[in-house]
Structure formats: structure tokens, C-alpha cells
A protein has these predicted regions:
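Short, Lys/Arg-rich, polar N-terminal cytosolic tail immediately upstream
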Residues: 1-15
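Functionally critical transmembrane alpha-helices in membrane proteins and complexes, commonly lining
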Residues: 14-90, 112, 317
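Transmembrane alpha-helical segments and their boundary/interface "anchor" motifs
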Residues: 19-20, 69-81, 85-128, 137, ...
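Alpha-helical transmembrane segments of multi-pass integral membrane proteins
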Residues: 63, 253-365
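Solvent-exposed interhelical
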Residues: 174-203, 230-246
Length: 387
């Protein structure tokens, strides 16, 4: 991400690495808290399914939901993907699309294949159960891999099996990666209309949320990242001008970002009918977009995202995202008679260690392989042209 940003003249993308790391940690917290049946009931019911202790109630139905807003963190990943994949295209005249496709697919599918095999191994070694005592989220995880489920998880584009639930987002990552030239063809012309087009993208997400049409909901989120890349310098200039001399400006932006990102849960807590609140989930899109902008241009948040810890989290974020959930579930089944806190205490450190190893031994190697594949395609193309 940082290299892509440098290539496009956007040197502050290092802070977005840290933001991505923070979002990955939020996803881990999200799945850890879903081990508690009461919070899993909140997540699936979207309402006060039962009386919660005050702090748990605040975690569920207030802006504090941000600390375990796993779904909204995935929206942030989608915006970042649109931004990061577009910047190198804009920076290089005559961008080599023939090299891009194999490079991108190796980069995505290599770690996914390894993660699926690891997840299948955890299911084999630690059998799963559908006992109601585990709560809704755990019970909804299938107990075994079938051949059909394995094919779904290894190919992604037709949907995933739910054995490793974070894989659902990779379906949309792959589709967006394949459709990136189409996004650019649609969004690069008529740049003066970008404000209207951003509003139209949010409107499409609203329609997708209202009609439960996943394509209409998810694919426009990537487009907002593409528009952000197209207007990067303009956004930076406007952010500097608008916040100059206004100490309250960035705090206000961050408050609005958090309120929008958690809007569905805040509204539920205020008594809004849960089905209506779920249809307002699209409000998280402008919220996570504001977080991306703030991480790039707000000095305080940028400094936080550039700390060593969040930079490390950003480096292992993809690996952590892929491997953590089967490990947490295995820890819960191994400690079934005890509180979910014990599963969290055991599972989270193991997941972090496995993620670090996975990043070094799997993800980084496929990243290097993807670069070699891209260079090989370019070299063959040059040879063919010279011949």
C-alpha cells in the first residue's frame, strides 16, 4: 500500500496501513465477542433479544459498538481496496493490465487456499458442535467440510460456505479486482461530477440495503475508494483549508464518522424498529469513508495510525483476517464448559502467533510470487512485441 501511494504521489498512505491494521483487530474483537451468546443474539436479531448488563448494552447499542464493528470494518477494507488498487493505475501511463490480472489473482488466491486448508485442519482436529449453549453465531458455523463447500471457498466468486466466515468478503474483493478497468472507464470521465457520483454510490448502497441485493450494496463501496483515489490531491487541499485554524474541525469529523459508522446500532438503541435500522446500514459507508480521509489527513489520527503497533498490525492484517476465526472457534469448543473469556484468552494469542507465521511463510511468499508472475508476463509481452 505504501509503495502504491508513493508511486501515485500520495505519501501519507502509510497511515492507511495502520488504519487497515486497526480494522483487522476490530474484526478479531468482533468474532471474539460473538462467542458470548447474548452478544451473538444482538448481532443476529438486531434488537434487544434479552436484557444485557449495562456495559454490554452500551457495546451493543451505542457508538462503543465501534470496538467490535466487524462488518463495518470490512466496508472500510473495501474502500481501501478501491483506493489502493486505483492509485498505481493513475500513476503509470500505459498501465499493464495483462500483468495486473495474474499478479492480483495470485496475491489473493494463494493465501486463501492456505487459509482454507488451515481452517479445514482445525475443523478436523477439533470437532464442532451445534449445541445451543454456544450461542447463535457458533451454532451457525457448519461442522464439517464437504467437497462442494471446499470448492466454493477455494473459488470464491460463486459464494462461500461459511466454514471460515471472513472469506465472504474475498468474493467481493475478487469481483472488484476483475472489474477494476470497468470502474475506471465509468468513473474517470466527467471528473467535475464526482460529488454527485459519490452521492449516487451511497444511494445505490441504500437501494441494496433496502432490497437485500448484495451486488448493489457491496460493489459501490469499492467505487467510492476509486473516486477517492481520483480526487486524492483535491481532498488533501480541501481538508487542509477547511481545518486550518479550526481546532474543532477534525474532532467533529471523527465524531460524525463514528456516529455514521455505528448508525444502525445507535438507532436500534434509540428504539428504531430493527428491520428499518438494518436498512439504514448504508449510513456506515460515509462513516468509514470519513475515517479513511481522517487517517490520511488528520495529524493526530495519522500519527496514531503510524505508530509501530498499528503498522505491525497493518502488515499482518490480511493474514490475521484469514486465520483467526477457525482458531477462536476451536478454542471455544476445547473450553466448552468454561466461560467464553477462557476461549478468548487462549484463542486470540494463538491466532496472532499463527497470523505472524502465516504472513512470513505464506502471504509474503505469494506476494513475491505475484510480483514475479507480473514481471514474467511483462517480459513475455516485450519479447512478443520485439519479435
Amino acid at each position: 500500500m505504501s509503495a502504491a501511494g508513493a508511486a501515485a504521489g500520495a505519501p501519507r498512505l502509510r497511515s492507511l496501513d495502520g488504519l487497515r491494521g486497526a480494522a483487522a483487530l476490530v474484526v478479531v474483537v468482533h468474532h471474539a465477542l460473538l462467542l458470548f451468546p447474548a452478544l451473538a443474539g444482538v448481532y443476529y436479531a438486531g434488537r434487544r433479544a434479552e436484557v444485557l448488563p449495562p456495559f454490554a448494552d452500551a457495546l451493543a447499542y451505542s457508538p462503543l459498538h465501534l470496538v467490535w464493528a466487524g462488518t463495518e470494518s470490512v466496508y472500510l477494507f473495501f474502500v481501501l481496496s478501491g483506493l489502493v488498487l486505483t492509485l498505481p493505475v493513475l500513476a503509470r501511463p500505459g498501465f499493464d493490465w495483462l500483468a495486473y490480472y495474474p499478479r492480483r489473482l495470485v496475491r489473493l488466491y494463494g493465501p486463501v487456499v492456505a487459509a482454507v486448508l488451515l481452517g479445514a485442519l482445525t475443523i478436523l482436529l477439533v470437532p464442532r458442535s451445534n449445541d445451543d449453549l454456544f450461542g447463535t453465531w457458533v451454532v451457525r458455523r457448519p461442522n464439517a467440510y464437504t467437497l462442494e463447500a471446499l470448492v466454493d471457498d477455494l473459488t470464491l466468486v460463486a459464494g462461500t460456505s461459511g466454514r471460515i466466515s471472513p472469506l465472504w468478503s474475498l468474493q467481493w474483493e475478487v469481483l472488484f479486482s476483475l472489474l477494476l478497468p470497468v470502474y475506471l472507464l465509468l468513473l474517470v470521465p466527467a471528473r467535475r461530477l464526482d460529488g454527485w457520483r459519490a452521492a449516487a454510490l451511497v444511494a445505490l448502497c441504500a437501494v441494496g440495503a433496502a432490497t437485500s441485493t448484495q451486488t448493489l450494496f457491496y460493489l459501490p463501496i469499492f467505487a467510492l475508494g476509486v473516486l477517492t483515489a481520483l480526487n486524492w490531491r483535491t481532498l488533501e487541499d480541501r481538508a487542509q483549508r477547511w481545518t486550518a485554524g479550526r481546532r474543532w474541525a477534525w474532532p467533529l469529523v471523527l465524531v460524525v464518522a463514528v456516529l455514521l459508522t455505528t448508525a444502525r446500532w445507535n438507532l436500534t438503541g434509540l428504539g428504531v424498529d430493527p428491520p428499518l435500522a438494518s436498512r439504514l446500514a448504508f449510513l456506515a459507508l460515509p462513516g468509514v469513508w470519513l475515517l479513511v480521509v481522517a487517517a490520511a489527513f488528520c495529524p493526530a489520527l495519522r500519527a496514531l495510525c503510524e505508530t509501530a503497533f498499528l503498522q505491525w498490525a497493518g502488515r499482518v492484517s490480511f493474514s490475521l483476517y484469514l486465520v483467526h476465526e477457525p482458531i477462536l472457534l476451536a478454542a471455544r469448543f476445547l473450553t466448552a464448559p468454561a466461560s467464553p473469556w477462557l476461549a478468548i484468552a487462549l484463542g486470540v494469542p494463538v491466532a496472532v502467533v499463527v497470523a505472524v507465521l502465516f504472513e512470513r511463510l505464506v502471504e509474503s511468499r505469494f506476494h513475491r510470487l505475484a510480483q514475479r508472475v507480473g514481471r514474467a508476463v511483462k517480459a513475455r509481452r516485450r519479447v512478443a512485441q520485439e519479435a
